[in-house]
């Protein structure tokens, strides 16, 4: 069922106010040196639940491999990206202290940008190679501290519902850190909010499928393309895109 005009306005108000609140909260915790990662995790999951409840979404998680986060090993979640709702769905469905690798432009948004940085999200500069390398070095450090990095290997949301071409950055990071890649396929998130619209659809059901982890430490730099292909095939299957 499509949301009415008033419901759309309400969803937008709740989204903006709850997002501003958690950004200010995390920023305050940083300023007062009382930041706690586990508490930040719980706040992000609370925020995600609020957004999903407002659109009446339900979700089912399939984890046939019983994926867990191995202490002492870097982890990268690589997921298809069809909707803004992939982010809250990931927070409520996937294991670990998840943070996103996001384009630098988002960090320039007042309050939101400061909140993301305070909560240990990582920016990536898509247009400046030297800065991108510095960003990836920062990502390596934060992964070593226990953060599970969420990456959309396409680099952006799909407007067609199909996987686009993969970018190399996330895979280079996985190879450099010997990370465990957790492939994830999200089915149905685009039906909640179609691309480039505010036409919310209420009561949709989404599937979050967690695949078999891929150990990037078993690959070398010359095998990068093989690693990319393996992960791509996994995500295609999990996202229901198998040919």
Annotated model-derived regions:
Residues 1-30, 42, 67-69, 222-243:
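Membrane-interfacial terminal anchoring regions of lipid-handling membrane enzymes
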Residues 2-6, 133-243:
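Non-catalytic C-terminal accessory region of glycerolipid acyltransferases
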Residues 19-22, 26-34, 38-42, 53-54, ...:
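Catalytic core of membrane glycerolipid acyltransferases/transacylases, capturing the structured
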Residues 48-57:
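A generic, lipid-embedded transmembrane alpha helix
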Residues 49, 88, 171-172:
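Active-site phosphate/pyrophosphate- and oxyanion-stabilizing loops and adjacent acidic/basic residues
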Residues 56-58, 97, 118, 146, ...:
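A generic structural signal for alpha->beta connector loops
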Residues 61, 77, 100-101, 208-210:
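Generic preference for hydrophobic
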Residues 65-71, 138-141:
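Short amphipathic alpha-helix with an adjacent loop that forms part of the alpha/beta core around
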């Amino acid at each position: 069922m499509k949301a009415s005009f008033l419901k759309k306005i309400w969803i937008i108000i709740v989204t903006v106010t709850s997002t501003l609140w958690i950004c200010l909260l995390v920023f305050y915790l940083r300023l007062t040196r009382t930041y706690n990662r586990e508490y930040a995790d719980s706040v992000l999951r609370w925020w995600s639940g609020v957004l999903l409840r407002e659109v009446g979404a339900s979700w089912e998680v399939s984890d046939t491999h019983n994926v867990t986060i191995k202490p002492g090993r870097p982890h990268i979640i690589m997921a298809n990206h069809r909707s803004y709702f992939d982010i809250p769905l990931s927070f409520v469905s996937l294991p670990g202290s998840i943070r996103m690798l996001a384009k630098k432009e988002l960090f320039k948004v007042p309050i939101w940008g400061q909140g993301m940085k305070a909560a240990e999200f990582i920016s990536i500069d898509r247009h400046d190679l030297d800065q991108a390398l510095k960003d990836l070095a920062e990502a390596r450090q934060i992964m070593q501290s226990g953060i599970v990095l969420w990456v959309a290997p396409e680099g952006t949301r799909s407007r067609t519902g199909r996987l686009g071409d993969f970018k190399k950055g996330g895979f280079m990071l996985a190879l450099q850190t010997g990370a465990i890649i957790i492939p994830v396929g999200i089915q149905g998130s685009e039906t909640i909010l179609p691309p480039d619209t505010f036409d919310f659809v209420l009561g949709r059901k989404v599937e979050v499928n967690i695949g078999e982890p891929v150990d990037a430490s078993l690959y070398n730099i010359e095998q990068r393309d093989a690693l990319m292909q393996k992960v791509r095939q996994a995500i295609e299957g999990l996202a229901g895109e198998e040919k």
